[in-house]
From Swiss-Prot:
Intrachain disulfide bonds: none
Source organism, top-level taxon: Viruses
UniProt family annotation: Belongs to the cytomegalovirus US12 family.
Protein name, UniProt field: Uncharacterized protein HVLF2
Keyword GTP-binding attributed: no
GO cellular component terms, A-Z: membrane
Main location: membrane
High-level lineage: Viruses, Duplodnaviria, Heunggongvirae, Peploviricota, Herviviricetes
Transmembrane segments annotated in the record for this chain: 50-70, 85-105, 128-148, 154-174, 185-205, 210-230, 245-265
Keyword terms: Glycoprotein, Membrane, Transmembrane, Transmembrane helix
Length: 309
């Protein structure tokens, strides 16, 4: 029995047997069908979330290159660049969401529906090459990290995540003949989720600032999601490369790069604004020595335009 959601006819047959015979076996069968239906719904949500996270991680892997192309001062002076729309980054993020849904229902769901009849991959060398190619995709992100002179913690967490994903990919490759296709998917997703939760726990339990936590969380999950997605796709060798979908994939990734870059830039602007507000609230020694007349004179002589961000 597969993980597909039972159709209306199948449910009627099961419940008809349940009411006709009244045996516990039929009751157990109906319970199993219901549980499998909920498992399938959960699987749909997980696959869509995985595709979305893969696109976001691929975008984060090349975010550093945008800071070399576009000057930071120009981007800060134009929050809605290049459309001059304030909410342009948030609106553009809806495109990857719709893209993930389209890719799932167009390509992933038919494969999942036929995985019980899918032939076992008999090209171990090609699987190994694809796994190594997915792992070598970390090198550009690692180079961007070094070029941007990120803190040592970011580089360390990224390298550790690379090592962990390499071990996970090797385990999946070794166990490909000892378990079924669904068991391999379960193994990959289980290891992926566990390592991701451990990574989040490490990041948010350290006494770091929020910008550093966001940076660590982004860069350290890039390799994990990249390797997880590639190790899933190598199980379906004929679905890894889709020439008819190259243009669509390139477009959605490019839009994701731009939107996430401006979102992170907006987070940085908010951090700068909060730091400026904290500096304004801190009492200085010179301000404590001023008299009330001096303070009123200074406030009246200061134009309001200088106080606006």
């Amino acid at each position: 029995m597969g993980l597909r959601f039972p159709t209306a006819t199948q449910r009627q047959i099961v419940f008809r047997r349940l009411f006709d015979s009244g045996n516990n076996d039929d009751y157990d069968e109906a319970a199993v069908v219901a549980v499998l239906g909920w498992v399938h719904r959960f699987e749909v949500v997980v696959r869509i979330a995985g595709l979305l996270l893969f696109q976001i991680s691929a975008a984060v892997a090349v975010l550093g290159s945008f800071s070399l192309v576009f000057p930071t001062a120009t981007l800060k002076s134009r929050p809605g660049f290049p459309c001059h729309v304030v909410w342009a980054p948030e609106v553009l993020l809806l495109v990857p969401v719709a893209s993930a849904l389209f890719v799932y229902f167009r390509y992933e769901r038919p494969v999942l529906a036929q995985r019980n009849r899918h032939p076992r991959c008999r090209r171990p060398f090609r699987q190994l090459v694809l796994l190594l190619a997915g792992l070598l995709a970390h090198i550009p992100a690692l180079g961007v990290t070094c070029a941007c002179q990120e803190p040592r913690e970011v580089l360390t967490s990224f390298v550790l995540t690379l090592v962990i994903t390499l071990l996970c990919a090797e385990v999946v490759f070794i166990c490909r003949d000892n378990c079924t296709l669904s068991d391999q998917f379960t193994l990959i997703n289980g290891v992926w989720v566990v390592v991701f939760l451990v990574n989040v726990l490490i990041v948010f339990t350290r006494p770091w600032t929020w910008p550093l936590r966001l940076l660590l969380g982004f860069y350290s999950t890039v390799g994990l999601i990249f390797a997880g997605h590639f190790s899933q796709q190598v199980l379906f060798v004929r679905h890894v490369l889709m020439p008819r979908d190259v243009a669509h994939t390139s477009l959605q990734l490019f839009i994701t790069f731009i939107s996430l870059f401006f979102l992170i830039l907006r987070i940085r602007n908010c951090q700068d604004l909060l730091s400026d507000l904290r500096l304004l609230e801190l009492p200085s020694s010179d301000a404590m020595t001023l008299t009330p007349n001096d303070l009123s004179h200074a406030s009246s002589s200061t134009p309001l335009s200088t106080l606006s961000p």
